[in-house]
C-alpha cells in the first residue's frame, strides 16, 4: 500500500 503524500514528490504518484 502506497503511503499518503506526507511530502511533495518530484513525480506524480501515477508514475510509481
Swiss-Prot record:
<keyword id="KW-0391">Immunity</keyword>
<protein>
    <recommendedName>
        <fullName>Metalnikowin-2B</fullName>
    </recommendedName>
</protein>
<keyword id="KW-0399">Innate immunity</keyword>
<keyword id="KW-0044">Antibiotic</keyword>
<comment type="function">
    <text>Antibacterial peptide active against Gram-negative bacteria.</text>
</comment>
<keyword id="KW-0929">Antimicrobial</keyword>
<dbReference type="GO" id="GO:0005576">
    <property type="term" value="C:extracellular region"/>
</dbReference>
<dbReference type="GO" id="GO:0045087">
    <property type="term" value="P:innate immune response"/>
</dbReference>
<dbReference type="GO" id="GO:0050829">
    <property type="term" value="P:defense response to Gram-negative bacterium"/>
</dbReference>
